């Protein structure tokens, strides 16, 4: 290995690991870079931003956290509603075997609902929704021995608890003590948050001693377990959210509690959010917590330049330039910077393609698609700063990890599930990918995969179709080759090619390194059936055959438009293991392979071919309009997540004693006087311009009472 490559890899790995200091890659001046402005300098953002509950709370990570802090510290009466929403989220991503008990717990604590606890085995009783029936099938399918044993243990414990509860309810009825209920939160030794604890009767009929409960139950909002405490068996009266729910909603929940359906609390959630979007949100808008939100938004809107980042080794190259690793100086977070050379873009007339890719990346916020964090320009290039994927691409892992090419079925199934989720997220936004292949599916540090390189993606208006012969030879669908109109069907054909290649170790219509003309590959795609070896089981073969159908009408995933991914996810190929789709989307399932954190899954620096200099192209004033549209700086959700993940939010988001405003949050604060010193002739340190108070228009000191401020996104 060349010395240049060794040095480049060493520096890059050190940056990835957070450096050798306690700042974890942050600049020594990071606090100065992220210093809050005085509130008077950013309160005018109220006129420019979407100040609605649906945006500030539902979509903005920092807004959501500040609203939580406001409710917890200033208006505890509202915190019960936040806790209810948190518990419903935990409920929705739980396995069916635990969900029924958690549902009963939520019903008792927040809705004052009691229902006889019953086991459901997929038949009889309450009608189960499609997803719940699917999970029951998964739970009864061929899981590994450990999972099966855990499930059996859980079911046995469930049966015992069910009998205990029913007997308890009968005895309570006979003794006419309706307010004394049996708490079954820890039916298998775990509470709703997964913290281990045990519940034992202390002899008092009206209370049970519970240990290890999360802070949310105490009104604290944290997730760590606390010490032991005594809780009324019927739950806390001050946890009830009945005042914002009508009797019909509560009755619907009562009737469905034993079904374990994922959405039984959905309408209650909407009602609670509608309440929070009213008076609670208006109170929040008048508080220092909302002013702190405006300060964060001011920082988020600051110009982004090349000085924002440190640049490291080249990782690869694209059509318009190279991709290199970079690190944000203020936070230490690593990204991949895709540099698009201005002259090369202009020479190839790729302005429209570049802008579409940028706009699509900015629109998508998915854990299965690389996210855009920043978009900025330099003198010579347009730069997209994206999620860095340190684990390499699937093509590398299929062919270059030693042994026989391809993956075992379980690993292929896991990657296929995550890619299917990514395609579904794109399709829901009306975006067709058009370039699904192993090179474009990247692994992160933890072994999860994401879709990358959206250069060929295009947005399709509702009910319309597009035409375009674009893609990669051997992965293009027959309708693309024939230049016919299509919607989302090409993505599911390419997905079938990807799944086939992961299992077989070669593409379905072209052998690895086979020298064959493009026309011959296109003919095979349109006419030849693919061949299946013993590596495929019946479910895998069936799925590939349905995905690789020549006719759109017969192809899996192509019958329900933007929601075609649901048909793909419902295929038996994904039923032969305990795959919980919501836990997958929440990143709670363990990947089958974790990349080596000390390895660089990229070509040597000297092996990455460099671009030649573009000649005969000049950049002039006519190009500035395009560059202005591109250069939009930080992407809101990605930037806020970065602040929280790197703990910048925790370290900077401090208030005064007893939750009082700090000087930068005091509306009528006077300028800080100069400190007197021993040397009057010394050079005075100027107060940073951003921290100096300025006059505030009166209308900005009142809350917004527009309709948008109470809009809740369902």
Curated annotation (Swiss-Prot):
Q: Which reaction does it catalyse?
A: [G-protein-coupled receptor] + ATP = [G-protein-coupled receptor]-phosphate + ADP + H(+)
Residues bearing the modification Phosphoserine: 612
Instruction: Domain (AGC-kinase C-terminal): give its ranges.
Output: 577-642
- Which GO terms fall under biological process for this protein? apical constriction involved in gastrulation; defense response to Gram-positive bacterium; imaginal disc-derived wing morphogenesis; negative regulation of smoothened signaling pathway; oocyte morphogenesis; positive regulation of antibacterial peptide biosynthetic process; positive regulation of receptor-mediated endocytosis; positive regulation of smoothened signaling pathway
What is the top EC class of this enzyme, as a single word? transferase
Give all residue intervals belonging to the Protein kinase domain. Answer: 309-574
**Alphabetical list of InterPro entries matching this protein:** AGC-kinase_C (IPR000961), GPCR_kinase (IPR000239), Kinase-like_dom_sf (IPR011009), Prot_kinase_dom (IPR000719), Protein_kinase_ATP_BS (IPR017441), RGS (IPR016137), RGS_sf (IPR036305), RGS_subdomain_2 (IPR044926)
Organism's domain of life? Eukaryota
User: Where this protein primarily resides, as one coarse class?
Assistant: membrane
Q: Where in the cell is it found?
A: Membrane
Q: Where is the composition biased (Low complexity)?
A: 154-175, 698-714
What Enzyme Commission number(s) appear in the record?
2.7.11.16
Spans annotated as Disordered: 141-229, 667-714
Region (N-terminal) location: 1-308
Provide the family line: Belongs to the protein kinase superfamily. AGC Ser/Thr protein kinase family. GPRK subfamily.
What is this protein called in UniProt? G protein-coupled receptor kinase 2
- The gene for this chain is Gprk2
């Amino acid at each position: 290995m060349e010395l240049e490559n060794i040095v480049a890899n060493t520096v890059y790995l050190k940056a990835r690991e957070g450096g050798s200091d306690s700042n974890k890659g942050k600049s020594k001046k990071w606090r100065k870079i992220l210093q809050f402005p005085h509130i008077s300098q950013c309160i005018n953002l109220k006129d420019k931003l979407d100040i609605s509950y649906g945006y500030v709370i539902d979509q903005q990570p920092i807004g959501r956290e500040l609203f939580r802090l406001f409710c917890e510290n200033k208006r505890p009466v509202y915190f019960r509603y936040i806790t209810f929403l948190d518990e419903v989220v935990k409920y929705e991503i739980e396995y069916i075997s635990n969900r029924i008990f958690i549902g009963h717990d939520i019903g008792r604590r927040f809705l004052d609902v009691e229902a006889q606890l019953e086991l459901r085995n997929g038949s009889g009783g309450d009608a189960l929704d499609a997803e719940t029936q699917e999970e029951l099938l998964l739970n009864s399918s061929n899981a590994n021995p450990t999972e099966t044993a855990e499930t059996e243990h859980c079911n046995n414990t469930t049966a015992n608890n069910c009998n205990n509860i029913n007997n308890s309810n009968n005895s309570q009825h006979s003794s006419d003590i309706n307010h004394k209920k049996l708490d079954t939160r820890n039916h298998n030794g775990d509470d709703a948050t997964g913290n281990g604890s045990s519940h034992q009767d202390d002899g008092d009929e009206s209370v049970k001693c519970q240990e290890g409960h999360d802070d949310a139950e105490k009104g604290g909002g944290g997730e760590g377990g606390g010490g032991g405490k005594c809780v009324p068996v019927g739950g806390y009266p001050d946890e009830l959210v009945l005042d914002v729910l009508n009797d019909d909603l509560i009755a619907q929940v009562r009737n469905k509690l034993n079904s374990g359906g994922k959405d039984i609390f959905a309408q209650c959630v909407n009602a609670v959010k509608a309440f929070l979007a009213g008076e609670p949100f208006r109170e929040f808008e008048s508080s220092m917590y909302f002013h702190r939100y405006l300060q964060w938004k001011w920082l988020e809107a600051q110009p982004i330049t090349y000085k924002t980042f440190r640049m490291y080794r080249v990782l690869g190259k694209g059509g318009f330039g190279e991709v290199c690793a970079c690190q944000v100086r203020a936070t230490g977070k690593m990204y991949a910077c895709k540099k698009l050379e201005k002259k090369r873009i202009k020479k190839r007339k790729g302005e429209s393609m570049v802008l579409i890719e940028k706009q699509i990346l900015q629109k998508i916020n998915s854990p299965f698609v690389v996210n855009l964090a920043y978009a900025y320009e330099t003198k010579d290039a347009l730069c997209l700063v994206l999620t860095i994927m340190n684990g390499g691409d699937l093509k590398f892992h299929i062919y270059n990890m030693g042994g026989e090419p391809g993956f075992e079925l379980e690993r292929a199934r896991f990657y296929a599930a995550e890619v299917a989720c990514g395609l579904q997220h794109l399709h829901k936004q009306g975006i067709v990918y058009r370039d699904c292949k192993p090179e474009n599916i990247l692994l992160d540090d933890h072994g999860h995969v994401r879709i990358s390189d959206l250069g060929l993606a295009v947005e399709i208006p509702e009910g319309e179709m597009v035409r375009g012969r674009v893609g990669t030879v051997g992965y293009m669908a027959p309708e693309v080759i024939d230049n016919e109109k299509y919607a989302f069907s090409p993505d599911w054909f390419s997905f079938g090619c990807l799944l086939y290649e992961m299992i077989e170790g070669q593409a379905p219509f072209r052998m690895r390194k086979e020298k064959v003309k493009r026309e011959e590959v296109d003919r095979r795609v349109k006419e030849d059936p693919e061949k299946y070896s013993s590596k495929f089981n019946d479910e895998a073969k069936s799925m590939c055959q349905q995905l690789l159908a020549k006719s759109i009408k017969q192809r899996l995933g192509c019958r329900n438009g933007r929601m075609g991914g649901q048909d793909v996810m419902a295929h038996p190929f994904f039923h032969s293991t305990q795959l919980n789709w919501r836990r997958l989307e929440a990143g709670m399932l363990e990947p089958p392979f974790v990349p080596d954190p000390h390895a660089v899954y990229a070509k040597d620096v000297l092996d990455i071919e460099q671009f030649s200099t573009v000649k005969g192209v000049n950049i002039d004033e006519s190009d500035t309009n395009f560059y202005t549209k591109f250069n939009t700086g930080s992407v809101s959700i990605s930037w806020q997540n970065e602040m929280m993940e790197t703990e910048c939010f925790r370290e900077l988001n401090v208030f005064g004693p007893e939750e009082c405003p700090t000087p930068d949050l005091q509306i009528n604060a006077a300028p800080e006087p100069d400190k007197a010193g021993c040397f009057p002739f010394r050079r005075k340190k100027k107060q940073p311009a951003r921290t100096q108070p300025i006059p505030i228009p009166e209308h900005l000191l009142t809350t917004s009472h527009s309709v948008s401020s109470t809009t809740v996104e369902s």
